[in-house]
């Protein structure tokens, strides 16, 4: 009896949905499609090479067995990638144009005692997937399902408030659901350093090492703060090696890629880069709206679509800022007993699209710190390549974040001519259109400038 390809694949999906866990099915199977069955070969199309490789490695036998049970005879399975969906490396937010389906994964069992370091809200079910974070989400789920097998280490990279910590802790929650006895350690780099200092002070280094090296999954947040801490880097290097050699999973999060962390030991940079570096970009409008919709659902509040659109359109930097705006809106409406309308929310939702008053001093400090040079170097007439490059980026960002004219920017950089500033700004503007790494660097520097400027703002 002949069967159409659509009917066959529908039956395959129906059976796999029962056989596999919901996260596995939603992430790896549901996004694939059967293209044709000919010459006893079933051709399956995946949205990207990442998904293809994962299916080939872990699920091709399962799929083949299900197809055989339906057709009554064995068939060869060939998995390929949809045309035009080639894998892009870091920064390729637009490369992952999968159907936007926000799978609802099971919330962790509330009866078990979780690690107190893990936020109960940071689970896969509450993470909204979009083109900006799809690769990081898929990699995190893969690690959660099979730690130590692929992507070890997994290095999550992205600006402030984009979901790195959420994904890391979701991995921890998911592992505990599968294996409650797993030793899941989530720690910030600052806490790792503090524990190390305490161990040295108390002469308990052996206990410190045994503790961290006993982890089944080690989740380390904000690794960029390891810069300049030589002894911390030394200890983390050996901890990393011990876990990796034992097949244990290491997940690291940072606001920048390993090769952009100043004063990071080369051997650590090499190890951080040996797995998968998954970049998370700022969410697009559709994803921001989905985030607001999901958060309102968890808060059991119905938001008018125009309110969602207004908040999503005006709060664009990161998820933390977006959710903060929603929280302020809900509090304001609740306190004053007003209808939920854009007009009523206008007084409390002062949009951050206004240019933050970044000072030239703050920008110079951030640039100097990032490129490991001094502010005096930036203001000097040195033509050394690294100083000249940092100076050009600084001029470009000062133009972006202040209202200073080209001559005034030149003055801030030690009295440079306005034509020098103009040339630098034009050069960086042209390069950023084709250099994804530079674009990411500029975003990260802009985030730091904004944070630096906020911290310098006097209290009212």
UniProtKB/Swiss-Prot annotation:
Which annotated residues bind ATP?
161, 163-165
Tell me which GO cellular component terms the UniProt record holds. cytoplasm; plasma membrane
Annotated region described as Domain III, AAA+ region, given as residue ranges: 117-333
**Region feature (Domain IV, binds dsDNA):** 334-460
Entries under InterPro entries matching the protein: AAA+_ATPase, Chromosome_initiator_DnaA, Chromosome_initiator_DnaA-like, Chromosome_initiator_DnaA_CS, DnaA_C, DnaA_dom, DnaA_N_dom, DnaA_N_sf
Major localization listed first in the record, in broad terms: cytoplasm
One GO molecular function term of this record is: ATP hydrolysis activity
Q: Which SMART domains match?
A: AAA, Bac_DnaA_C
For the region Domain II, what residue ranges are annotated?
73-116
User: Taxonomically, which superkingdom?
Assistant: Bacteria
What keywords sit in the KW lines? ATP-binding, Cytoplasm, DNA replication, DNA-binding, Lipid-binding, Nucleotide-binding
Q: Where is this region: Domain I, interacts with DnaA modulators?
A: 1-73
| GO biological process entries | DNA replication initiation; regulation of DNA replication
Q: Kindly list the places in or outside the cell where this protein is found, as annotated in its UniProt entry.
A: Cytoplasm
Quote the record's domain comment: Domain I is involved in oligomerization and binding regulators, domain II is flexibile and of varying length in different bacteria, domain III forms the AAA+ region, while domain IV binds dsDNA.
Q: Which family does it belong to?
A: Belongs to the DnaA family.
Q: How does it assemble?
A: Oligomerizes as a right-handed, spiral filament on DNA at oriC.
Q: What does this protein do?
A: Plays an essential role in the initiation and regulation of chromosomal replication. ATP-DnaA binds to the origin of replication (oriC) to initiate formation of the DNA replication initiation complex once per cell cycle. Binds the DnaA box (a 9 base pair repeat at the origin) and separates the double-stranded (ds)DNA. Forms a right-handed helical filament on oriC DNA; dsDNA binds to the exterior of the filament while single-stranded (ss)DNA is stabiized in the filament's interior.
Q: How is this protein named in the record?
A: Chromosomal replication initiator protein DnaA
Source organism of this protein record: Trichormus variabilis (strain ATCC 29413 / PCC 7937) (Anabaena variabilis)
Corresponding gene? dnaA
């Amino acid at each position: 009896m002949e069967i159409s390809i659509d009917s066959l694949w529908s039956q395959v999906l129906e059976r796999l949905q029962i056989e596999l866990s919901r996260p596995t099915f939603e992430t790896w199977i549901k996004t694939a499609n059967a293209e044709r069955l000919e010459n006893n070969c079933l051709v399956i199309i995946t949205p990207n090479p990442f998904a293809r490789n994962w299916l080939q490695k872990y699920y091709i036998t399962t799929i083949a067995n299900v197809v055989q049970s339906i057709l009554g005879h064995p068939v060869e399975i060939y998995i390929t990638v949809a045309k035009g969906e080639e894998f892009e490396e870091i920064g390729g937010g637009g490369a992952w144009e999968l159907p936007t389906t926000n799978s609802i994964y099971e919330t962790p069992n509330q009866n078990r005692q979780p690690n107190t370091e893990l936020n109960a809200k940071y689970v896969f079910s509450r993470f909204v997937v979009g083109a900006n974070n799809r690769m990081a989400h898929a990699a995190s789920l893969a690690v959660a399902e099979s730690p130590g097998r692929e992507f070890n280490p997994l290095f999550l990279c992205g600006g402030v408030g984009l979901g790195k910590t959420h994904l890391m802790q979701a991995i921890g929650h998911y592992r505990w659901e599968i294996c409650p006895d797993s030793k899941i350690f989530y720690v910030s780099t600052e806490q790792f350093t503090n524990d190390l200092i305490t161990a040295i002070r108390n002469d308990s280094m052996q206990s410190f090492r045994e503790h961290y090296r006993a982890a089944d999954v080690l989740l380390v947040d904000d690794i960029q703060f390891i810069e300049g801490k030589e002894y911390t880097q030394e200890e983390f290097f050996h901890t990393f090696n011990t876990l990796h050699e034992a097949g244990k999973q290491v997940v690291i999060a940072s606001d920048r890629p390993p090769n952009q962390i100043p004063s990071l030991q080369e051997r650590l940079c090499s190890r951080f880069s040996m797995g998968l570096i998954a970049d998370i970009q700022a969410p697009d409008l559709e994803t921001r709206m989905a985030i607001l919709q999901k958060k309102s659902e968890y808060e059991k509040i119905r938001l008018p679509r125009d309110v969602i659109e207004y908040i999503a359109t005006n709060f664009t930097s990161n998820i933390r800022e977006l959710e903060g705006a929603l929280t302020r809106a809900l509090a304001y409406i609740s306190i004053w007993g007003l209808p939920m309308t854009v007009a009523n929310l206008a007084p409390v939702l002062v949009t951050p699209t206004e240019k933050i008053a970044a000072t030239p001093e703050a920008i110079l400090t951030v640039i100097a710190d990032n490129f490991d040079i001094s502010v005096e170097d930036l203001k000097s007439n040195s033509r050394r390549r690294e100083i000249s490059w940092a100076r050009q980026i600084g001029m470009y960002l000062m133009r972006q974040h202040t209202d200073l004219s080209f001559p005034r920017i030149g003055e801030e950089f030690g009295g440079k001519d306005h034509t020098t500033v103009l040339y630098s700004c034009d050069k960086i503007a042209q390069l950023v259109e084709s250099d994804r790494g530079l674009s990411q660097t500029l975003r990260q520097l802009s985030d730091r400038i904004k944070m630096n400027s906020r911290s310098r703002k006097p209290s009212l």
